């Protein structure tokens, strides 16, 4: 009798497991891949998505996956949406306001009564990671691959991915210069297949400051910098910040550590 019960229970659990696995697979299948959406694999030769196409895809991800939320932090210099994509587990998304409050308390010692409360907040909070892409628009790899990263986090049921999503709130800014991301892609696609295909954009890829938008982290003169500081850094005080760049086809290839504290008073240490 006991054997029959255990056997039946085992079959029931197996059926439940198969159902859950199928549901997870179905969920992943319902999130469109970058390739199915754009018509080519992101990162493939001679293919660039512009900002309009990329932001539309992020809205599709948010509609298809409960792990993804898209916020427009403001408008760029030329009126494009400046977006931040927040990715975490559905459970964390459902208590995002609570987790945000915990993060803000951890960032301000005046809001924590002592060591005991500090440890409690650390235990129930989540690690906040900010990834930014594409401040220099001719470094096309960052804004393009953001779509692949966000798709994987939105759809994958790999154990490692679920572990990350359970413990991390990812704030992803797919382009720090959406105007340039749009212009560079549009220029390339306009001349694709002609003798001018490899020609550089003939104007600055940021309307006012060109390449030097990366030098605006102390003066905050540009709208894109202001949106990033107010909507990400000051709004969340992330523990980890990863700014993605791309090397050119020539020139120096060696990076040296700073061997000194990178003191920047406008960025959390």
Where are these regions (language model features)?
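Second-shell loop/turn segments in exported
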Residues: 41-48, 132-139, 214-218
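N-terminal secretory signal peptides that target proteins for export/translocation
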Residues: 1-6
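Surface-exposed loop and adjacent secondary-structure segments within mature catalytic domains
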Residues: 30-31, 74, 83-91, 98-106, ...
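Conserved beta-strand elements of the Class I
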Residues: 128-130
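Bacterial N-terminal signal peptides
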Residues: 8-24
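Mature N-terminal segment immediately following signal peptide/propeptide cleavage
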Residues: 30-86
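Sec-exported extracytoplasmic/periplasmic mature domains
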Residues: 59, 63-66, 150-158, 218, ...
């Amino acid at each position: 009798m006991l054997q029959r019960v255990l056997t039946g229970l085992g079959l029931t659990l197996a059926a439940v497991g198969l159902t859950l696995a199928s549901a997870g697979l179905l969920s992943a299948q319902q999130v469109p891949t970058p390739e199915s959406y754009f018509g080519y694999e992101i990162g493939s030769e001679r293919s660039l998505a512009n900002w309009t196409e990329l932001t539309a895809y992020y809205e599709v991800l948010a509609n298809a996956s409960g792990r993804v939320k898209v916020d427009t932090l403001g408008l760029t210099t030329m009126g494009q949406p400046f977006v931040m994509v927040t990715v975490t587990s559905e459970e964390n998304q459902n208590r995002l306001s609570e987790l945000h409050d915990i993060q803000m308390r951890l960032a301000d010692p005046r809001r924590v009564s002592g060591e005991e409360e500090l440890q409690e907040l650390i235990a129930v909070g989540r690690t906040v990671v900010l990834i930014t892409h594409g401040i220099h628009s001719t470094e096309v790899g960052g804004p393009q691959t953001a779509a692949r990263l966000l798709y994987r986090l939105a759809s994958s049921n790999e154990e490692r991915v679920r572990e990350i999503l359970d413990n991390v709130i990812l704030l992803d800014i797919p382009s720090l210069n959406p105007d340039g991301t749009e212009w560079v892609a549009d220029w390339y696609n306009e001349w694709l297949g002609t003798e001018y295909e490899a020609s550089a954009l003939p104007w600055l890829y940021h309307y006012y400051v060109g390449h030097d938008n990366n030098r605006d982290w102390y003066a905050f003169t540009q709208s894109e910098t202001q949106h990033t500081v107010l909507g990400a850094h000051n709004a969340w005080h992330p523990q980890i910040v990863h700014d993605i760049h791309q090397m050119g086809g020539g020139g120096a290839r060696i990076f040296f550590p700073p061997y000194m504290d990178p003191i920047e008073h406008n960025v959390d240490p």
